[in-house]
Swiss-Prot record:
Its main location: endoplasmic reticulum. Heme binds at C437. Pathway: Lipid metabolism; fatty acid metabolism. Its cofactor is heme. Substrate binds at F298, A299, G300, T301, E302, T303. This is Cytochrome P450 2E1. Its EC number is 1.14.14.1, 1.14.13.n7. SUPFAM superfamilies: Cytochrome P450. Interacts with chaperones HSP70 and HSP90; this interaction is required for initial targeting to mitochondria. One of its GO terms (molecular function) is Hsp70 protein binding. The omega-1 hydroxylase activity is stimulated by cytochrome b5.
């Protein structure tokens, strides 16, 4: 009888929880955008393909329209699909939706740094970081010289492969890693430096793990899954190791800091910290400095590295495009002069290819989640404060009206009828508004200069027939992860 009583009590308890959950879901749905009816606790998880959530969003948008609501666990999510909705949220309502949506795997850093910070320090830290990055040449001539210098190191390393097959992941990745390391720490690594290779391995592994089905599940049901084994623990461990490195670099800088003569971004942040050392609520603590540096280091290395690597794979599949690029490089730059930013005006095809690579690979398809900072009326719906908002970037990059045959790689998407470069307002690979990527100018410059330098000196050779190269990402979640591959680079005669 005792066992039966306990069983009945448990059933009543579970039933009560289910009823409360259903009631909450229905109650909280008033005035929200439409969407599929959520199951208790689980929400709409079965409406999503965890191996390709952006594709699921596209299917749901066809059914419910460009603005729709999902419930995942206790999270209420509004998804925006298409140019009009995404642009309106990111630009016309940029203050109302400037919060950072909760990402549980990075919960420890929710109120620190730039990328995942959703606390009171975010605006000031971001504003100051942008200011010092500009001072250190972000998107300006200072960075052009840095990238040109690193491009020559990269070319020399590629020559050492002597035409033999190699995995480009870390060799190519060293170039953007060194550019951002010079800006942040006044330091560059040798291409075989163990610490550099270790850091890039951590960046690469985290970018991959963030895109796996388990992490998509974890970020929506963290309350139930956080104590289980899984790759979320590996990500947290990797982030801790990266942050430990930036913390050590900050401490090293502090020992020789001259507040009147900053050597790099780290010094600039530490000088602000020194100014606040008597404040009761300092913004620039050593913890916040180290997380900010880790954010910039990861973002400045991995995204550009992955884009370049994916770009090389694409060019091997389409050798006729590579040939056109060689012709343009030979005509504008020649065989020996170092590529420069000014060349972009005379190289519309290279400019178009760089943009098309970014559009086609769709590196961060669903953007990082935003959050409503206040109750907001949007297109006739009420989006309550705290709602996670996802402006899907892939819905712009793969818009079939703006980019005919969006599933195909076509540099012509960014060329007019006269062969001149044609910019598209749908090109939002770096997002837009208050949360736009702080390194957009640097990344654009790196992609153009590094790819130009590689193709100036080398022909790309695939180990398989170009027709057999599969460009499909191995997984799509936080990012679109390219397949692993090897290639040969053959010096051009």
């Amino acid at each position: 009888m005792a066992v039966l009583g306990i069983t009945i009590a448990l059933l009543v308890w579970v039933a009560t929880l289910l009823v409360i959950s259903i009631w909450k879901q229905i109650y909280n749905s008033w005035n929200l955008p439409p969407g599929p009816f959520p199951l208790p606790i689980l929400g709409n998880i079965f409406q999503l393909d965890l191996k390709d959530i952006p594709k699921s969003f596209t299917k749901l948008a066809k059914r419910f329209g460009p603005v729709f609501t999902l419930h995942l666990g206790s999270r209420r999510i509004v998804v925006l699909h298409g140019y009009k909705a995404v642009k309106e949220v990111l630009l016309n309502h940029k203050n109302e939706f400037s919060g950072r949506g909760d990402i549980p795997v990075f919960q420890e850093y929710k109120n620190k740094g730039i990328i995942f910070n959703n606390g009171p320090t975010w605006k000031d830290v971001r504003r100051f970081s942008l200011s010092i990055l500009r001072d250190w040449g972000m998107g300006k001539q200072g960075n052009e010289a840095r990238i040109q210098r690193e491009a020559q190191f990269l070319v020399e390393e590629l020559k050492k492969t002597k035409g033999q097959p190699f995995d480009p992941t870390f060799l190519i990745g060293c170039a953007p890693c060194n550019v951002i390391a010079d800006i942040l720490f006044n330091k560059r690594f040798d291409y075989n430096d163990k610490k550099c290779l270790r850091l890039m391995s951590l960046f690469n592994e985290n970018f991959y793990l963030l895109s796996t089905p388990w992490i998509q599940l974890y970020n929506n049901f963290a309350d139930y899954l956080r104590y289980l084994p899984g790759s979320h623990r590996k990500i947290m461990k990797n982030v801790s190791e990266i942050k430990q490195y930036t913390l050590e670099k900050a401490k090293e800088h502090l020992q020789s800091l001259d507040i009147n003569c900053a050597r790099d971004v780290t010094d600039c942040l530490l000088i602000e910290m020194e100014k606040e050392k008597h404040s009761q609520e300092p913004m620039y603590t050593m913890e916040n400095v180290s997380v900010t540096l880790a954010d910039l280091f990861f973002a400045g290395t991995e995204t550009t590295s992955t884009t370049l690597r994916y770009g090389l794979l694409i060019l091997m599949k389409y050798p006729e495009i590579e040939e056109k690029l060689h012709e343009e490089i030979d005509r504008v730059i020649g065989p020996s002069r170092v590529p420069a930013v000014r060349d972009r005006l005379d190289m519309p095809y290279m400019d178009a290819v760089v943009h098309e690579i970014q559009r086609f690979i769709n590196l961060v398809p669903s953007n990082l989640p935003h959050e409503a900072t206040r109750d907001t009326v949007f297109q006739g719906y009420v989006i309550p404060k705290g709602t996670v908002v996802i402006p899907t970037l892939d819905s712009l990059l793969y818009d079939s009206h703006e980019f005919p045959d969006p599933e195909k790689f076509k540099p012509e998407h960014f060329l007019n009828e006269n062969g001149k470069f044609k910019y598209s307002d749908y090109f939002k690979a770096f997002s837009a508004g208050k949360r736009v990527c702080v390194g957009e100018g640097l990344a654009r410059m790196e992609l153009f200069l590094l790819l130009s330098a590689i193709l100036q000196h080398f022909n790309l050779k695939s180990l398989v027939d170009p027709k057999d190269i599969d460009l499909s990402p191995v997984t799509v979640g936080f990012g679109s992860i390219p397949p692993q591959f090897k290639l040969c680079v053959i010096p051009r005669s």
